[in-house]
Design a protein with these regions (language model features):
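Short, positively charged
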Residues: 1-41, 47-279
């Protein structure tokens, strides 16, 4: 080390000749390549510990009790679909809205299709939530809208399963390379789930800054306690992706699942609610 340091110090060139004895030493200790054969671009790892470090906040989620959702629906979490195709008369709209039980959202969606109507994604009902979603990606609201459609019509609720369906549908019309090599849809969903876990709410302006929540203490079905924290962001995001699902909230409470007229146009709203798997 002293020989190398002296040679570097004395040279004014970027390339320095290896001092006598250095090559022999490297051969003796069987070091033949000084360049790391890995994608890890770090030089070394350091952990800092301090008694002055501030306390950090954690949320508790337990499969043994009530599992509070990551996103608790609400009217601000409604996404709007414009009814296009056939123009329905008022009696037809009334017939559609009266179809099935109150929570038979899929039944009313299918009836619209049978009668020649098309539900085309339009917008997020709440402007604050729209902006929050656009912080993930400008096209992310459309992706969520298609995931909601798949949940209701195909009965898929797990986030990982919904993403597999979305990769086949490709609602954003992106290139296959982005879908499969870059895992675009998985990446965007993980970003969103992390934002929800760390404080994003539909009706509160989100600027990308995390709240006081630093992670989850998760109690599994056997009573084991697992810790997920934003310091290990990839592990946390993977956990959320595998263990999250879309849920159905109350149609009456959150005002969705029916054709509603706005400025002469009919819209059909779907509600976004996301929770953790109970099993």
């Amino acid at each position: 080390a002293e020989l190398v340091f002296a040679a570097v110090k004395e040279s004014r060139e970027n390339d320095v000749m290896s001092p006598d004895g250095v090559e022999e030493f490297l051969d003796e200790v069987a070091i033949y390549d000084l360049e790391a054969k890995t994608d890890d671009r770090t030089d070394f790892y350091v952990a800092f510990y301090s008694i002055e470090a501030p306390l950090v906040g954690f949320c508790v989620r337990s499969r043994l009790g009530t599992m509070f959702p990551l996103l608790d629906g609400g009217r601000a979490a409604n996404l709007k679909f414009e009814q296009t195709g056939v123009k329905f008369a008022t009696p037809t709209v009334n017939k559609i809205n009266a179809f099935g039980e109150e929570d038979d959202v899929a039944g009313r969606m299918l009836m619209i299709e049978r009668l020649g109507g098309i539900l085309k994604y339009n917008d997020v009902a709440d402007k604050v939530f729209r902006s929050n979603l656009c912080m993930i990606d400008l096209h992310f609201p459309r992706m969520l809208g298609e995931m909601l459609r798949v949940m209701h019509l195909d009965g898929i609720s797990k986030v990982s399963g919904l993403i597999e369906a979305i990769k086949q549908i490709n609602p954003l019309k992106i290139k296959d390379e982005l879908i499969h090599k870059h895992s675009y849809y998985e990446y965007k969903m993980k970003q969103f789930l992390m934002a929800l876990a760390l404080g994003m709410r539909p009706a509160k302006i989100f600027n990308g800054i995390d709240s006081a929540i630093s992670g989850f203490l998760f109690v599994d079905g056997n009573g084991e306690i697992l810790c997920y924290q934003k310091a290990d962001r990839q592990v946390f995001a993977d956990f959320l992706f595998v263990n999250s699902r879309f849920e159905k909230s109350s149609t009456e409470k959150d005002k969705y699942g029916y054709l509603e007229r706005e400025n002469g146009v009919y819209y059909f709203k779907l509600n976004l609610k996301i929770g953790l798997l109970k099993r």
